[in-house]
């Protein structure tokens, strides 16, 4: 019924390209003299723990559209990407930001499992953008391919399946060579999937009340209160001012009861070693439970007093304040370059994150629990096949994977993986002067092993669930195992240090299918498929909700998209 626009030459490249295995490549290692040293803060001093923790608002759909194929609802949203200013320092000038709906972080999506969504991202900013719903098994055309940009004055409709189990996803910019600056200035937000199975566990709940988003970033400011740009940075942008939900070093009033915290490291380059401490004994780490990681709940809670989290990782923890009534608890960040695992520069105050002021009593009894059994995690079937090897390093000034940069269009496709295949990938960081959080699009993976490393760190107990990002510390090798399903297409994998990503530490893999796969596959294989490209718009039409933004036009557009059945394979 529908024709694809993928040319013969492109099809040949996708289905016949040979994977490039890891081989020795020239590497230049930066000096490591800064490790384990604390240096003076460069940004102006900020009055810590004086501003309450902000909670991003919940995004509401503009309308619902009936799917003509199955009769189910599709929720339609509009998000305007636009510049705005924000008074960060109370006694200095404002900072120039660009955010989703003119806020940073962007609004939080809360979507029930099984409800498809179409989100129209409208670029009313000055720079191109591309949006990645991180952790979703979106079709390639809606996955935020780095070159699939939306220019200013255009919009793109992203169609999301929301078929996965409950989990904390996030959406952020992914535009070629400008992801760091776009995300740094505000283009990031949470996208939460919910489902009845998780709700039935009776974990601490109530968004913004006892279920708290915690989006971590690290920035740097000029003497007048504006942001220092990331442009021109080639190694890492650490930042010396820690933010939670866009606010430097906030505080939160809490009750002496259990709270669920959804941590996301949305920083450009900074990783964290998070722990809770009583201000009466600041060097003593308090126990808490990790209940979920990138791809949803663990099988069992993991008890710990220290949580390593790198860029793009998500962890959900439950901390019980009931033993600390009337006290002050701080969330802290481990110094010494995160215990020697990281290479981050420690500034005067980057060991502090935020403060919790615990009330003397609860307003109502705490009936929430943390069950010993959270769920049966759908791990991929084990494989004994030889792992593919991918070496993350540096070739001259360029960050590369197996010596290949993303700008090398002819060679950046490093793997062809038949849909439905389980594979092990060996991720290698031979460098001593950098670390790499590695994100593989489309899939959830199991962390099988972690070896070598300067600290002999193994797989942490809270890494026992499914993930989509794994942190490669200095000189570490990590093996991950994933089921490459449910969709064919060309997808990215890359380092999520956004400076490294922007400077080409990114590659592609092709989840392949036979030509007679049996349903409308090829129209979604190419992430640059013309059918789904961004479209120009008139600002007046958007503001008046007319033309392409009228209810009739939006309904027709979404129903046409649904007729292609982009997510039919997930139901088979």
Curated annotation (Swiss-Prot):
Which family, according to UniProt? Belongs to the multicopper oxidase family.
Binding, Cu cation 1: 132, 439
Q: Where does Cu cation 3 bind?
A: 174, 441, 494
Which Pfam families does the record associate with it? Cu-oxidase_2, Cu-oxidase_3
Q: What EC number(s) has UniProt assigned to this enzyme?
A: 1.3.3.5
Give binding positions for Cu cation 4: 436, 495, 500, 505
A GO MF term:
bilirubin oxidase activity
* Signal peptide positions (record): 1-19
Role played: Oxidation of bilirubin and other tetrapyrroles.
Plastocyanin-like domain residues are 98-194, 404-526
Positions of the propeptide segment:
20-38
Question: Sorted alphabetically, which SUPFAM superfamilies does this protein's record hold?
Answer: Cupredoxins (SSF49503)
Please name the top-level EC class of this enzyme.
Answer: oxidoreductase
What keywords sit in the KW lines?
A: Cleavage on pair of basic residues, Copper, Glycoprotein, Metal-binding, Oxidoreductase, Repeat, Signal
Q: Per its record, how is this protein called by name?
A: Bilirubin oxidase
Reactions performed catalytically: 2 (4Z,15Z)-bilirubin IXalpha + O2 = 2 biliverdin IXalpha + 2 H2O
Q: What is the free-text note on the cofactor?
A: Binds 4 Cu cations per monomer.
Task: Tell me which residues are glycosylated.
Answer: 510, 520
Which residues are involved in binding Cu cation 2? 134, 172, 496
Question: What InterPro entries does the annotation carry?
Answer: Cu-oxidase-like_N, Cu-oxidase_C, Cu-oxidase_fam, Cupredoxin
Q: What are the names of the required cofactors?
A: Cu cation
């Amino acid at each position: 019924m529908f024709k694809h626009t993928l040319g013969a030459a492109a099809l040949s490249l996708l289905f016949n390209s040979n994977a490039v295995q890891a081989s020795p490549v020239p590497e230049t290692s930066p000096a490591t003299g800064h490790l384990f040293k604390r240096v003076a803060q460069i940004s102006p001093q900020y009055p810590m723990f004086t501003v309450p923790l902000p909670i991003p608002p919940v995004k509401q759909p503009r309308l619902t559209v009936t799917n003509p194929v199955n009769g189910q609802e599709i929720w339609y949203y509009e998000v305007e990407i636009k510049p705005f200013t924000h008074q960060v320092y109370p006694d200095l000038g404002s900072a120039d930001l660009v955010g989703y709906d003119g806020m940073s972080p962007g609004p939080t999506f809360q979507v029930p499992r099984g409800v498809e969504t179409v989100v129209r991202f409208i670029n009313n900013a000055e720079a191109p953008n591309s949006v990645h719903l991180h952790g979703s098994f979106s079709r390639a055309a809606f996955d935020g391919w780095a070159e699939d940009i939306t220019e200013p004055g255009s919009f793109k409709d992203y169609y999301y399946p929301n078929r996965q189990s409950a989990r904390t996803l996030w959406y952020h910019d992914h535009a070629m060579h400008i992801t760091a600056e776009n995300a740094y200035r505000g283009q990031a937000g949470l996208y939460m999937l919910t489902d009845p199975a998780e709700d039935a566990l009776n974990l601490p709940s109530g968004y913004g009340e006892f279920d708290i988003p915690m989006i971590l970033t690290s920035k740097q400011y000029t003497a007048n209160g504006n942001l220092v740009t990331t442009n021109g940075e080639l190694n890492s942008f650490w930042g010396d001012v820690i933010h939670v939900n866009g606010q430097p070093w906030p505080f939160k009033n809490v009750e002496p009861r259990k709270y669920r915290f959804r941590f996301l490291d949305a920083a450009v380059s900074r990783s964290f070693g998070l722990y809770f401490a009583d201000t009466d004994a600041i060097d003593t780490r308090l126990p808490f439970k990790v209940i979920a990681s990138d791809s949803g709940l663990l099988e069992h809670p993991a008890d710990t007093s220290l949580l390593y989290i790198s860029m793009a990782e998500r962890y959900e923890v439950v901390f019980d304040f009931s033993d600390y009534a009337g006290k002050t608890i701080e969330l802290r960040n481990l110094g010494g370059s995160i215990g020697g695992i990281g290479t981050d520069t420690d500034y005067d105050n980057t060991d502090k994150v935020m403060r919790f002021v615990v009330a003397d009593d609860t307003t109502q009894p705490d009936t929430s629990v943390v069950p010993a059994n959270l769920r049966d995690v759908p791990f991929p079937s084990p494989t004994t096949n030889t792992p593919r090897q991918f070496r993350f390093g540096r070739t001259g000034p360029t960050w590369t994977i197996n010596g290949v940069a993303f700008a090398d269009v002819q060679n950046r496709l490093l793997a062809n993986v038949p849909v439905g295949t389980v594979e092990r990938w060996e991720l290698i960081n031979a460098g001593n002067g950098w670390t790499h959080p590695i994100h593989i699009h489309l899939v959830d993976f199991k962390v099988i092993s972690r070896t070598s490393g300067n600290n002999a760190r193994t797989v942490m107990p809270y890494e026992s669930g499914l993930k989509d990002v794994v942190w490669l510390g200095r000189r570490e090798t990590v093996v991950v195992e994933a089921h490459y399903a449910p969709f064919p297409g060309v997808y990215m994998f890359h380092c999520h240090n956004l400076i490294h990503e922007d400077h080409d530490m990114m590659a592609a893999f092709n989840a392949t299918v036979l030509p007679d796969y049996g349903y409308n596959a090829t129209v979604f294989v190419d992430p640059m498929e013309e059918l789904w490209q961004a479209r120009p718009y008139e600002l007046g039409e958007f503001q008046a909700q007319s033309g392409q933004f009228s209810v009739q036009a939006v309904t027709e557009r979404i129903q046409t998209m649904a007729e292609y059945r982009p997510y039919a394979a997930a139901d088979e």
